[in-house]
Amino acid sequence: MNIAELYGKMGKHSWRIMDAIFKNLWDYEYVPLQLISSHARIGEEKARNILKYLSDLRVVQNRQKDYEGSTFTFIGLSLYSLHRLVRSGKVDAIGKLMGEGKESAVFNCYSEKFGECVVKFHKVGHTSFKKVKEKRDYGDLHFSVLAIRSARNEFRALQKLQGLAVPKVYAWEGNAVLMELIDAKELYRVRVENPDEVLDMILEEVAKFYHRGIVHGDLSQYNVLVSEEGIWIIDFPQSVEVGEEGWREILERDVRNIITYFSRTYRTEKDINSAIDRILQE
């Protein structure tokens, strides 16, 4: 998606309509037109026309069944979250798409306050959020709320881990997390010359995370970055706090995954149980 081009097509009334949708996502799967009109302080007919325009741009999805209502698409939620970052003075220019997967889309951007950085737009929520049973008058919890909670989860985890081998995190709005741009490559893309040392560095960070009360939750070769300067661990939407239900099993899985990768790729010999015990005892 060309989010910069799309951003330029939004006017003040479009943002007011999107404000109204955002504020009511927690109460409605599709926010009723009457409520959007009221919150945006725009007449219903004009609001309907703006929503049609936004739908044509794939920013919102409208429906007529049962009642007339609208909700965000992933692009729309990301666009609106970017707008909140711009409005708060955190982002001044958005760049190109750097990468996109099932869980997020990452763009480079520029901030006068923070310099060159990246903004990560979350697509889906934390696994546990998918089991939310909240019911509302107009349907179930919308995926947008799950994406927002996923972004919030990552932001809060990174805040607790600042100063360790993680990106500096600057802001969170909607489904967007603004963070430091790290010039490094994913572990699976490179051939490291000192695998035992790199593995030890990763496990040391896992131990530091644990002592700050955080378990990554999805540690693998895909979210470890390496360069000549060291290693960084990224992607924390599935992180859990130490003490949450199942945290120990999640920690053990993280350790097992990364040790198994090094064993298969570099024939390293690291005992998984001993590594886990060391993390818990340090």
From Swiss-Prot:
Pfam families assigned: RIO1, Rio2_N
Swiss-Prot/TrEMBL GO biological process terms: maturation of SSU-rRNA
Catalytic activity: L-seryl-[protein] + ATP = O-phospho-L-seryl-[protein] + ADP + H(+); L-threonyl-[protein] + ATP = O-phospho-L-threonyl-[protein] + ADP + H(+)
Residues at which Mg(2+) 2 binds: 223, 235
Molecular function per GO: ATP binding; metal ion binding; protein serine kinase activity; protein serine/threonine kinase activity
InterPro entries for this protein: Kinase-like_dom_sf, RIO2_wHTH_N, RIO_dom, RIO_kinase, Tyr_kinase_AS, WH-like_DNA-bd_sf, WH_DNA-bd_sf
Binding site residues for ATP: 98-106, 120, 126, 180-186, 222-223, 235
Residues holding Mg(2+) 1: 103, 235
Swiss-Prot/TrEMBL keywords: ATP-binding, Kinase, Magnesium, Metal-binding, Nucleotide-binding, Phosphoprotein, Serine/threonine-protein kinase, Transferase
Claim: Transit peptide is one of the keywords in the record: no
PTM annotation, UniProt: Autophosphorylated.
Cited SMART domains: RIO
Record note on cofactor: Mg(2+). Mn(2+) is seen in the crystal structure; there are 2 Mn(2+) ions in the ATP-bound crystal and 1 Mn(2+) in the ADP-bound crystal.
Enzyme class: transferase
Keyword flag Phosphoprotein: yes
Annotated Protein kinase domain residues: 92-282
Record: active site: 218
Protein family (similarity comment): Belongs to the protein kinase superfamily. RIO-type Ser/Thr kinase family.
PANTHER family the record matches: SER/THR-PROTEIN KINASE RIO2, SERINE_THREONINE-PROTEIN KINASE RIO2
Subunit structure as annotated in this protein's UniProt entry: Monomer.
Name the record gives this protein: RIO-type serine/threonine-protein kinase Rio2
Native species: Archaeoglobus fulgidus (strain ATCC 49558 / DSM 4304 / JCM 9628 / NBRC 100126 / VC-16)
